[in-house]
Amino acid sequence: MDIKAYFELIRLKNCLTASFGAFIGGLIASYFNLAMVDNLILASIVVFLVCGFGNALNDIYDLKIDRINKPKRPIPSKRITLNNAKVFSYSLVVMGLFISLFNISCFLMAVLNSIVLQQYASTYKKNKIIGNLIVAYLTGSVFIFGGIAVGNIDVTIMLFLCALFAMWSREIIKDYEDIEGDLKEKVISIPIKCGERSIYIAAFLLIFAIFLSPLPYLFGFFGIYYMISVVFCDLLFLFGIYKLVFNPSKMEAKKASRNIKIVTNLVLIAFLIGSLFK
């Protein structure tokens, strides 16, 4: 068995990033209560397995396209058979759901996200108007999952909302960057429907994420150190989207997309600072 091919199928780096997000979300929600580490480890394993299921499922549904566009992927290159990929992907989700039973709320959310991943791969991947929102939801939901694992979702809901709107904005910007390829693949996206106006939609979503970012401070969950950190992040967000709005080129879109990804990680650090130095 080609282990490397299976790691490639599940996109190992993405799975590790998602599971780390759940762990960090739980740390933030528990204010670094180390008594909750066991729950956080279990939650991280669940997220890893369910994420792997979703990524493998994408390759299964994309087989026809990948034979042309990505022939070196594990299934079209025949390093993994289609049947083995199906068995493997569903084995991952079954294991993930079983482990999630350590907390009934975690189990219910794992079931929900597994269904969402199935629907995304089978139905909404070519309809990016809905697909972008799904990707943004899934990205942010790992933080809530970590919060559920430790029994406190108050702060992680705010982190989820900030991540959701920032990632939703980023997905639209990425589609603007890839508009020619999406036209060839007959994909439905906001940039295809709206053209350059889609940049204003992306800017609005990002500004809404910025608008939400002070809430943990205003509601008394975090102190001034969080506020200082997140204002710095907000300024970086604004700088990137400002440049794109006034120069809506593909190159600037690429820079803005990268900026949002980096700054979203900095926002996560701001939440960590807020949790540590309340």
UniProtKB/Swiss-Prot annotation:
EC code(s) of this entry: 2.5.1.42
Keywords for this protein: Cell membrane, Lipid biosynthesis, Lipid metabolism, Magnesium, Membrane, Phospholipid biosynthesis, Phospholipid metabolism, Transferase, Transmembrane, Transmembrane helix
GO molecular function term, any single one: magnesium ion binding
Top-tier EC class: transferase
Pfam families xref list: UbiA
Chain segments annotated as transmembrane: 12-32, 34-54, 92-112, 129-149, 153-173, 204-224, 226-246, 257-277
Catalytic activity: sn-3-O-(geranylgeranyl)glycerol 1-phosphate + (2E,6E,10E)-geranylgeranyl diphosphate = 2,3-bis-O-(geranylgeranyl)-sn-glycerol 1-phosphate + diphosphate
UniProt cofactor(s): Mg(2+)
Membrane topology reported for the UniProt record: Multi-pass membrane protein
Function (record text): Prenyltransferase that catalyzes the transfer of the geranylgeranyl moiety of geranylgeranyl diphosphate (GGPP) to the C2 hydroxyl of (S)-3-O-geranylgeranylglyceryl phosphate (GGGP). This reaction is the second ether-bond-formation step in the biosynthesis of archaeal membrane lipids.
Name under which the protein is recorded: Digeranylgeranylglyceryl phosphate synthase
